[in-house]
């Protein structure tokens, strides 16, 4: 009974972690199109689009795509954005 009560309280407070949704196929396609417009490198853009699926979630994919289009990540996303760029470069540009 106590466990049920604690679960209800945590749900009400919004403190139970939820699993974020993976990026969508449409986001992956948009990422690839935007990347190709910048880099004109199929191997790199294909790799980065694929890597993004395992490195970031659906919300953050929008942050990345907006940044690729010239936007800046919000302050709260800045560290995560830099981490994403570093990890995707490790995967797709190992000698970078």
Question: What are the roles of these predicted feature ranges?
Answer:
Residues 20-95:
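Post-signal/leader-peptide non-cytosolic segments of secretory proteins
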Residues 1-20:
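Classic N-terminal secretory signal peptides
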């Amino acid at each position: 009974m106590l466990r049920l009560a604690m679960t209800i309280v945590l749900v009400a407070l919004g403190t139970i972690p939820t699993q974020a949704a993976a990026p969508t196929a449409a986001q992956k396609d948009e990422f690839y199109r935007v990347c190709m417009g910048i880099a004109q490198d199929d191997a790199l853009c294909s790799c980065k689009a694929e890597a993004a699926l395992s490195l970031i979630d659906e919300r953050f994919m929008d942050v990345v795509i907006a940044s690729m289009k010239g936007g800046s990540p919000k302050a709260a996303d800045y560290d995560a954005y830099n981490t994403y760029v570093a990890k995707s470069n490790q995967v797709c540009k190992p000698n970078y």
